[in-house]
Amino acid sequence: MDNRPIGLLDSGVGGLTVARELLRQLPNEEIVYIGDTRRAPYGPRSREQIIAFTWDMVNFLLSKNVKMIVMACNTATAMTLEIVKEELDIPVIGVILPGASSAIQKTKTNKIGVIATQASIRSDEYHKTIARKSSAIEVLSLACPKFVSIVESNEMESEIAKRVVSESLAPLVGKIDTLILGCTHYPLLRSLIQETMGKEVRLIDSGAEAVRDISVLLNYFEINAHERKEYQHCFYTTAGVNSFREIAEKWLNIGHLHIEHAEIENFNKEK
């Protein structure tokens, strides 16, 4: 048993979708979350920038004595997961493999769509992961760069959001039966995405799927937390504390969250 917290990292608020599912499925666990909102979105960034920024967040979480790191960010997972895993002696998990595996199980027509940031689509990690498991599946990938900005600005229910989602997803409508939400920001737009794609299309939340793998790793390494009466979940953001708080408290349905501003660039010294 291990009562140290689980660390989650993301380029902003998107990883809160993973945090919500983690708190629901694993209620005994404490979390420390870092969102690099100041440098979001990561999608247009170069591979070198994404690696450097991810190490900033990883080292920040290590300073909080976490027992596991969850890359609650598809872009970071695509670009840095294997690099970070090789360097650390604690478990590190990403969100791409769990999402891809679930989509393979759910599709009935062998036509899967993937929507993600530009960097994730460029990496082709979802396509490669699915191809390794099943050569019969056709994967249609689509970058939706505007979605992250909508979520980070807390405009998920606006008319602009409806129009952007509808226009962005038009190339996939009628062509797939399963759609991977390949960015942890995207579940915050789930209702609009479902409305656009049609109720017959199954939406796969890659972050939520990852929590099942987190549970397996906790058991395997015997680092589950004891049941406890008090929890101190800590959330950090590199910019926009008030906006982050508004989104986090609404999405997690938890009031009075412990949210602080964090400077993380100095945590990159050794990498």
Curated annotation (Swiss-Prot):
Catalytic activity: L-glutamate = D-glutamate
Domain of life: Bacteria
InterPro entries: Asp/Glu/hydantoin_racemase, Asp/Glu_race, Asp/Glu_racemase_AS_1, Asp/Glu_racemase_AS_2, Glu_race
Top EC category: isomerase
Keyword Cell wall biogenesis/degradation in record: yes
Keywords assigned: Cell shape, Cell wall biogenesis/degradation, Isomerase, Peptidoglycan synthesis
E.C. number: 5.1.1.3
Biological process annotations from GO: cell wall organization; peptidoglycan biosynthetic process; regulation of cell shape
Gene3D superfamilies in the cross-refs: 3.40.50.1860
Keyword Isomerase included in the entry's annotation: yes
Pfam families: Asp_Glu_race
Residues involved in substrate binding: 10-11, 42-43, 74-75, 184-185
Active site: 73, 183
Involved pathway(s): Cell wall biogenesis; peptidoglycan biosynthesis
GO molecular function list: glutamate racemase activity
Family: Belongs to the aspartate/glutamate racemases family.
Free-text function comment from the UniProt entry: Provides the (R)-glutamate required for cell wall biosynthesis.
Protein name: Glutamate racemase
